[in-house]
Curated annotation (Swiss-Prot):
UniProt entry keywords in alphabetical sequence: Cytoplasm, Lipopolysaccharide biosynthesis, Nucleotidyltransferase, Transferase
Pathway: Nucleotide-sugar biosynthesis; CMP-3-deoxy-D-manno-octulosonate biosynthesis; CMP-3-deoxy-D-manno-octulosonate from 3-deoxy-D-manno-octulosonate and CTP: step 1/1; Bacterial outer membrane biogenesis; lipopolysaccharide biosynthesis
Domain of life: Bacteria
Protein family (similarity comment): Belongs to the KdsB family.
EC category name: transferase
Predominant subcellular localization, coarse grouping: cytoplasm
An example Gene Ontology molecular-function term: 3-deoxy-manno-octulosonate cytidylyltransferase activity
Membrane-crossing residue ranges in chain numbering: none
Lineage, uppermost ranks: Bacteria, Pseudomonadati, Pseudomonadota, Gammaproteobacteria, Enterobacterales
Name the record gives this protein: 3-deoxy-manno-octulosonate cytidylyltransferase
Organism: Klebsiella pneumoniae (strain 342)
Catalytic activity of the protein: 3-deoxy-alpha-D-manno-oct-2-ulosonate + CTP = CMP-3-deoxy-beta-D-manno-octulosonate + diphosphate
Subcellular location: Cytoplasm
Length: 248
């Protein structure tokens, strides 16, 4: 099957300035992400960035770059700019990999593309089971609940579904009903065009989760359990050191 990978790589980062160019064992982080994307079998891979130094690093590694504006409010808006500049047809399948995921398994990049291709929805994503109580109650770990057909009912930073009887007695064990959302998305290009035409939703602004805009406007997001659990993403200097050690 045919699909395109777009990797947004914003240079500015409050917790880790110049994040895409941080060195991981001799290569910039964005190059590690690019290499993982290549292993997925994507037909085309584009790094979308607002900074010339990131563009130079990607081009030096033989990658394709699309320069984007620096004032986008979300990663999806940056994707939409690339979709328009590259004039992708509405049925083109696009997988969005974050530029701070140097350990993302190539298999799940392809998985989300294949799931979208076999679904009637315009958007697809992945999740993994939560086994750790600390993660279950951590608002930085986004949870998702699905319906019987594998479509998202809701995403939240809260602990959903709330196991009333279990949690009334103890929060040390969590059962097997919780899923953590992974920030990888597949879209049809036409869906991205529609998404950015919608006003931000109240739920999205409360939870600070832009995927809630899709549910607010009555659209569906296909969710599947990831074939592999992705490694550590990089948000902080501590994350960066962990990834360096794991990839050494």
């Amino acid at each position: 099957m045919s699909f395109v990978v777009i990797i947004p790589a914003r240079f500015a980062s409050t917790r880790l300035p110049g994040k895409p160019l941080q060195d991981i064992n001799g290569k910039p982080m964005i190059v590690h992400v690019l290499e993982r994307a290549r292993e997925s079998g994507a037909d085309r891979i584009i790094v979308a960035t607002d900074h010339p130094d990131v563009a130079s690093a990607v081009e030096a590694a033989g990658g394709e770059v699309c320069m984007t504006r620096a004032d986008h409010q979300s990663g999806t808006e940056r994707l939409a700019e690339v979709v328009e500049k590259c004039a992708f047809s509405d049925d083109t399948i696009i997988v969005n990999i974050q530029g701070d995921e140097p350990m993302i398994p190539p298999a799940i990049v392809r998985q989300v593309a294949e799931n979208l291709a076999s679904s009637s929805s315009g958007m697809a994503t992945l999740a993994v089971p939560i086994h750790d109580a600390e993660e279950a109650f951590n608002p930085n770990a986004v949870k998702v609940v699905m319906d019987a057909q594998g479509y998202a009912l809701y995403f939240s930073r809260a602990t959903i579904p709330w196991d009333r009887d279990r949690f009334a007695h103890s929060r040390e064990t969590i059962g097997d009903s919780l899923l953590r959302h992974i920030g990888i998305y597949g879209y049809r290009a036409g869906f991205i065009r529609r998404y950015v035409s919608w006003a931000p939703s109240p739920l999205e602004q409360i939870e600070m989760l832009e995927q809630l805009r899709v549910l607010w406007y009555g659209e569906k997001i296909h969710v599947a359990v990831a074939a592999e659990v992705p490694g550590t993403g990089v948000d902080t200097p501590e994350d960066l050191e962990r990834v360096r050690a794991e990839l050494r």
